[in-house]
């Protein structure tokens, strides 16, 4: 253990300089280690693999006492291929790719020495991260690189590639934005990319040409070379430098649009053990074992990385630091984060925020894929106060129901979920979160049925929609998937002339509308704003482009849906009251008004950074219109979100204290303090104390017909203070008490009542305190019209 601890500060991998390259690798049990250099990537077999590595030029490596083997080659090796030759105690000889390699040949068969400065695109040194003040300011958008552009209707030159994200100015036949400009117009702050490190299950040599509709497809949760970009997204996987440059171009293009990049990382398992990145160098060390000495399987794919071990922890932290520094990655989403011990997660967050960038975002799945012997699992609750967030499956279930079946939630028609939805909308601070920035709120992501398909299934519409039955990327009964998707009718029943009237559309907007109007960090699945379908495939990890590709033609067909998403995101970004960072803020400024009969209503009041003093959000899960009482106020209400449109502009104003909310819809209103309701009487109380000690004094009023409760005094000229409130038309008498703070003291022993004469526009009352000099209080009435 002392040996291992001393290794955790050593820089491993290949360090390339013009004068020479240093190689360092940790292989503690090896008898001999040699560096093998090659001029070519080797001979590929039919499976796209290089299995013969005997042709390299060998260099002896020296071992120090810590199990680290080193070699220096005194020349510029940029672009040279390399491997490590490992001789074990039993005499066996194996070749291994450097787990710290930053470039590899096609399909990751050999490492490549690279001078990373030569991979930088123009403008890279001037790249800056878009501003992010706090995690709850984020709006996340989960997206697969290939899905984004591969369909022919995208009109992109670099379909399926990193470079598709650099293509600006694209429009459809009706002038709607496509691709990169679409993301900017939508308003998301972060694009969360599914795995972009080198993964195993796609042969980069099979149909890698731009726009190829090859069957080769995978989400990428099968890691091979953790510190290298995936080659199938490059325009030429045979060029080991090009994939690095093109990924940097992607990040540069998104940053230029004000969009940050989150990387989906999989440090819980590798695709294989024997042929994976670690086992040949440190047999038995990197993988977790059960009590019988067998590989544990908490990932569900046959192995788990032993993150609690020092050199595994070092590897993960080094890898994350590399991506954040070299690629300017802005955040990380951790797959099956419960398989990463909490000590490692805490160190990741604290060290990278302290030493790289304080605004880096960290979040992940707080569950496993099976039983694990790890005792210190990063599950819901373990994130409290630690600076990272977790996916909120409680909220997800309350909104939509189960993942793949007919189970329903609030947005899909089930009663009794109001309380669970309210809990989620309050940032789950009374559930598992200490603060709202610890919960990632979402309805669907890449796993399971996507939102549109889930709504169809939950509402019993799958046969009408012609949803497919698929498993492992194939139709259950055989056949061509492209033909099957073309014959499917997932949008049957949506009238082209009035998209927003369809119940399924309204349910989809209700579901993600709840997410976007909740405290916490919202996450959307790419294409939800276009009513994206995966044709009923609940596990499309290898189902190919026919199922997974985003259909950009949906934008002009469902433009009102896109506009609604765009408006909700703009509303959230414009008003800090929707993005509170601390539980104390929520407890002070958020009040639940109603949570029953499939109606949820809450108000946000007097948030100090928000220009709107009072905001009311109403969610109607009924299929019919419901009437909801609004909080009393002397001002008119301005509606900015209804069942047809959303944003920050006023749709309609109203004087009434009730509102009719259409079925399956959202309503957002704010108190417009520039427009006072008609027929109100202003009541002004002028309060005088000889000691002029007005701090904490307020007037408690009731019977106003507008807004009852405490009204603070504000100091005015002449050593006096003034409180102003309003009485509704027809009010005859208003009660009041002058008190200190929350009833610590009061003026007089009896309640006071103020008569409100009809037709009076203003009533003034003057009070002289009896508390500071012992004299009798004096009262003077001044009626003013």
Which stretches of residues belong to each language-model region?
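Carbohydrate-binding surface patches
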Residues: 15, 19-31, 591-631
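Substrate-binding/active-site clefts of carbohydrate-active enzymes
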Residues: 146-327, 337-357, 361, 373
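C-terminal accessory region downstream of the catalytic core in glycan-modifying enzymes
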Residues: 38, 500-505, 509, 550, ...
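The feature marks proteins involved in alpha-glucan
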Residues: 1-18, 44-45, 51-56, 64-170, ...
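Conserved, mostly hydrophobic/aromatic
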Residues: 25, 84, 143, 193, ...
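C-terminal beta-strand-rich structural cap/linker in extracellular carbohydrate-active enzymes
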Residues: 27, 79-80, 652-679
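Conserved alpha/beta catalytic core and glycan-binding cleft of carbohydrate-active enzymes
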Residues: 114, 349-526, 530-531, 539-541, ...
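Glycan-recognition and catalytic regions of carbohydrate-active enzymes
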Residues: 508, 514-520, 524-536, 549-615, ...
């Amino acid at each position: 253990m002392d040996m291992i601890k001393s290794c955790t500060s050593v820089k491993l991998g290949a360090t390339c300089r013009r004068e020479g390259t240093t190689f360092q690798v940790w292989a503690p049990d090896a008898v001999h280690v040699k560096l093998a250099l090659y001029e070519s990537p080797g001979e590929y077999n039919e499976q796209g693999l290089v299995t013969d590595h005997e042709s390299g030029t060998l260099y002896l490596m020296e071992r120090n006492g810590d199990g680290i083997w080193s070699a220096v080659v005194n020349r510029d090796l940029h672009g040279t291929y390399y491997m490590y030759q490992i001789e074990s105690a039993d005499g066996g000889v194996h070749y291994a790719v450097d787990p710290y390699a930053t470039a590899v040949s096609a399909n990751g068969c050999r490492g490549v020495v690279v001078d990373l400065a030569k991979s930088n695109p123009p403008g890279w040194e001037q790249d800056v991260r878009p501003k992010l003040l706090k995690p709850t300011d984020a709006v996340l958008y989960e997206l697969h690189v290939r899905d984004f552009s591969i369909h022919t209707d995208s009109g992109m030159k670099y379909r399926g590639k990193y470079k598709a994200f650099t293509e600006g100015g694209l429009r459809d036949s009706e002038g709607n934005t496509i691709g990169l400009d679409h993301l900017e117009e939508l308003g998301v702050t972060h694009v969360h990319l599914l795995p972009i490190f080198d993964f195993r299950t796609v042969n980069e040599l099979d149909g890698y040409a731009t726009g190829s509709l090859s069957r080769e497809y995978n989400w990428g949760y099968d890691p091979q070379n953790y510190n290298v970009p995936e080659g199938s997204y490059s325009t030429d996987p045979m060029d080991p430098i090009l994939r690095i440059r093109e990924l940097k171009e992607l990040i540069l293009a998104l940053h230029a649009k004000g969009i940050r990049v989150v990387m989906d990382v999989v440090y819980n398992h590798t695709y294989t053990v024997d042929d994976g990145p670690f086992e040949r160098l440190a047999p038995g060390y990197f993988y977790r074992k059960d009590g019988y000495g067998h590989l544990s399987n908490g990932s569900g794919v046959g192995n788990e990385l032993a993150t609690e071990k020092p050199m595994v922890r070092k590897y993960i932290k080094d890898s994350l630091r590399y991506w954040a520094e070299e690629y300017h990655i802005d955040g990380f989403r951790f797959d099956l984060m419960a398989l990463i011990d909490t000590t490692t997660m805490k160190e990741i967050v604290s060290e990278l925020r302290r030493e790289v960038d304080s605004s880096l975002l960290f979040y992940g799945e707080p569950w496993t894929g099976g039983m694990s012997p790890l005792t210190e699992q990063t599950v819901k609750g373990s994130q409290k106060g630690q600076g990272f967030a977790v996916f909120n499956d409680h909220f997800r279930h309350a909104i939509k129901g189960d993942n793949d079946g007919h189970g329903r939630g609030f947005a899909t028609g089930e009663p009794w979920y109001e309380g669970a939805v309210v809990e989620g909308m309050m940032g789950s601070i009374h559930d598992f979160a200490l603060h709202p920035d610890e919960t990632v709120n979402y309805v669907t992501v890449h796993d399971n049925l996507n939102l549109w398909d889930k709504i169809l299934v939950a509402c019993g519409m799958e046969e009408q929609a012609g949803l497919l039955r698929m498993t492992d990327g194939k139709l259950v009964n055989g056949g061509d998937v492209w033909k099957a998707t073309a014959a499917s009718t997932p949008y049957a029943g949506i009238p082209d002339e009035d998209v927003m009237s369809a119940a399924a559309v309204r349910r989809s907007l209700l579901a993600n509308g709840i997410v976007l109007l909740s405290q916490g960090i919202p996450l959307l699945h790419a294409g939800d704003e276009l009513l994206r379908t995966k044709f009923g495939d609940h596990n499309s990890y290898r189902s190919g482009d026919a199922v997974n590709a985003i259909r950009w033609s949906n934008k002009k067909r469902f433009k009102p849906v896109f506009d609604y998403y765009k408006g909700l995101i703009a509303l959230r970004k414009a008003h800090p009251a929707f993005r509170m960072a601390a539980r104390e803020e929520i407890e002070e400024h958020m009040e639940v008004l109603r949570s029953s009969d499939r109606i949820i209503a809450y108000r946000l009041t007097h948030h100090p950074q928000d220009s709107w003093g009072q905001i009311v959000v109403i969610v109607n899960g009924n299929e019919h219109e419901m009437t909801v009482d609004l909080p009393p106020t002397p001002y008119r209400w301005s509606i900015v979100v209804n069942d047809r449109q959303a944003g920050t502009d006023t749709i309609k104003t109203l004087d009434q204290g009730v509102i009719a909310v259409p079925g399956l819809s959202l309503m957002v209103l704010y108190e417009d303090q520039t427009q006072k309701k008609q027929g109100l009487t202003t009541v002004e109380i002028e309060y005088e104390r000889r000691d002029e000690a007005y701090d904490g004094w307020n007037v408690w009023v009731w019977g106003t017909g507008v807004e009852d409760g405490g009204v603070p005094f504000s100091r005015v000229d002449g050593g006096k203070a003034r409180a102003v409130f309003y009485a509704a038309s027809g009010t005859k008498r208003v009660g009041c008490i002058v008190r200190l703070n929350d009833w610590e003291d009061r003026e007089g022993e009896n309640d006071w009542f103020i008569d409100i004469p009809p037709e009076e526009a203003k009533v003034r009352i003057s009070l002289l305190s009896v508390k500071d000099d012992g004299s009798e209080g004096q009262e003077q009435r001044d009626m003013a019209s």
